[in-house]
């Protein structure tokens, strides 16, 4: 059972969780028209990042982190993390979605 991604249902609200690998290579500038990768995530989802999306962390989200879904392919995604969680390069952990693809040919993972 290599898939560690799961979907929790709290009341009427579905919250997808993803087991991700935090990438070191995320230091590239945000795409044109966005002030940061966090701004990119917020504009693509239409939501405010709020708190860190790492499960169990409740600090303010300050970074748009580059991650890959563990056992999920080579696609890169952006997810809001606090700076402390984002600098744990190479770590695997659960995050709450949605995940926004870095390459726009892929769909947002809700």
Task: Kindly give the residue locations of the regions a language model identified.
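Short cysteine-rich loop/turn motifs with clustered Cys
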Residues: 37-62
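Substrate-binding/catalytic groove segments of enzymes
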Residues: 62, 89-94
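"Short basic amphipathic alpha-helical interaction patches in structured regions
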Residues: 67-70, 79, 94-101
């Amino acid at each position: 059972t290599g898939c560690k991604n799961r979907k929790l249902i709290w009341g009427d609200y579905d919250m997808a969780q993803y087991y991700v690998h935090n990438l070191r290579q995320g230091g590239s500038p945000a795409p044109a028209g966005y002030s940061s990768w966090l701004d990119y995530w917020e504009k693509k989802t239409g939501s405010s990042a709020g708190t860190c999306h790492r499960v169990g962390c409740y600090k303010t989200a300050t970074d748009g982190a580059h991650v890959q879904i563990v056992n999920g392919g080579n696609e890169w995604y952006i997810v809001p993390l606090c700076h402390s969680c984002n600098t744990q390069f190479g770590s695997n952990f659960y995050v709450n979605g949605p995940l926004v693809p870095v390459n726009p040919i892929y769909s947002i993972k809700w």
